[in-house]
Amino acid sequence: MSLQAPKGTKDLLPTESYKWQYLENKFRNIAADFGCREIRTPVFEYTELFQRGVGETTDVVQKEMYTFEDKAGRSITLKPEGTSPAVRAFVEGRLFNETQPTKMYYFTPVMRYENVQKGRLRQHHQFGIEIFGAKDASVDAEVISIPVGIYKELGVEGVELNINSIGCPKCRKTYNEALKKYLSKNYDKLCSTCKTRFDKNPLRILDCKVDTCKEIVKDAPIILDYICDECKDHFESLKSYLDVLDIKYKVDPFIVRGLDYYSKTVFEFIIDDITICAGGRYDYLIEEIGGPSMPAVGFGMGIERLLLTLQEKAIEIPEEAYVDLYLGNIGDKAKLEVLKLAKELRDRHIKCEIDHMGKSVKAQMKYANRIGAKYSMVLGEEELNTGKVSLKRMEDGKQIEVDIKEIDTLIKVFK
C-alpha cells in the first residue's frame, strides 16, 4: 500500500506553490508599508504557553491541540495559533526594552486536531500581524486596515467586518455575573462542555457551536451594556478612527473569539458566512507570559481560506514564467556548449532550462512550451560553426538572430 499524507494535511505541489509565493510577497510588501518586520518561531512550544495564553477552558486547549511528551518527559504542543509564540519570543528576547511600538508579521503553520472542513485543515497556515506597546485605539484601526487593504488589492468583494468590545477583566466580571444569572435559567439545556464553562469562564459559552447553546445565547445580555467607561471610550474611539479611514463595519455584540487572551477590541472579517480573518487586542497576555504589563493587538489570516475565497470568486493569481530561456541542443558537442552558456546566463540571474534527457528537437520544443519558457533556442553543429543562433519568442514565434558569444545582447532581451 502506498503511503499518503495524514488526514487533514495537504502537499503544496509546484503547480500551486506560485499562488502561495504571490500572496506571501504581497503580504510582505503590505506589512513593510506599516513598518512591520518578520518573526519566525518554533513549530512546537511547551504546552504551558498555550494553557496560560489561550486559556484552559477553550476548545483549542481542551480538544484541539496536538500534545505529547518528549523523551525528557516535558509536555510539548504543536502550535495551534501564532500569537502566543510571538508574545513568548517578544518576552524572551526582551524586546520590551526597545523603543515601542514593536511591529511584527509572520507566516506560520498551525496544527489543530479538529474536523476537516472547507478551507480548514488540521495543518493550515496563517499570515499574522502583532503590534506591541501601543494602547490607543488608533493602532487597532491600523491593524484592521491591513486586511482591508489586502482584500482590496486582491479584488475580493463582499467581505464584511464585524467588531465588538469584550471589555477588560474589571468590567467583564460584572458582565459574567449577569450572563451566569441569565444562563442559569437554561443550565440543564447547556452542553456538557458549557456546563463546565459556566463557573470557570461563562463568556466562552457565547462561542459554543452546539445548536442548543447557540439558541440559548441569542437572548443573552449584551456585553457592550456592561463595559466600563474606559473600555467604552476605547471602543467609541475605534469606531471614529474606522470612520475616518472610510472602513465600513458592523457592531456584533456576540463576537468573543475562541481564545481567552483577548480584551477590549475583537473583530472578524466574514465572507459567505465564513470567517477568513480575525483578531483583537490582548493587553494582558504579555504579562501573563512573564513580561511587563504592556498592551498589544493583532490578527491572524488563514491562507488556505483566502485561496479558497479567491477560487470561489474566480479571481486568478498570475503565474509568472519560471523559465526565461529554454536551451535546446543537438549532439554531445552542442550539449557542452549549452551547459557553459546556461551557467553564464544563470550567473546573471537568467532562469534557464536545458535538456538532460536526450530528447528530439521536437520533444524539446514541446517541453519548452509546457513549462512556459519565454524564449527558446537550439544549438546544433551549424550554430556552433557559424556562432549564430535563432532566439525564438514562444508567445508569438517571432525569431531574431543573436551571436552565441554576445552574452550582454542576450541579457538585454531578458531584462
Curated annotation (Swiss-Prot):
Record field: transmembrane: none
A cellular component term, taken from the record's GO annotations: cytoplasm
UniProt cross-references to CDD domains, sorted A to Z: HisRS-like_core (cd00773), HisRS_anticodon (cd00859)
One annotated GO molecular function: catalytic activity, acting on a protein
Signal peptide: none
Enzyme class: ligase
Pfam families: HGTP_anticodon, tRNA-synt_His
InterPro entries referenced in this protein's UniProt entry, alphabetically: aa-tRNA-synth_II, aa-tRNA-synth_II/BPL/LPL, Anticodon-bd, Anticodon-bd_dom_sf, His-tRNA-ligase, HisRS-like_core, HisRS/HisZ, HisRS_anticodon
Alphabetized UniProt keyword annotations: Aminoacyl-tRNA synthetase, ATP-binding, Cytoplasm, Ligase, Nucleotide-binding, Protein biosynthesis
Assigned EC number: 6.1.1.21
Catalytic activity, reaction form: tRNA(His) + L-histidine + ATP = L-histidyl-tRNA(His) + AMP + diphosphate + H(+)
GO process annotations (BP): histidyl-tRNA aminoacylation
Cell compartment(s), UniProt: Cytoplasm
Quaternary structure note: Homodimer.
Alphabetical list of PANTHER family matching this protein: HISTIDINE--TRNA LIGASE, MITOCHONDRIAL-RELATED, HISTIDYL-TRNA SYNTHETASE
Protein family membership: Belongs to the class-II aminoacyl-tRNA synthetase family.
NCBIfam families documented for this protein: hisS
Protein name, UniProt field: Histidine--tRNA ligase
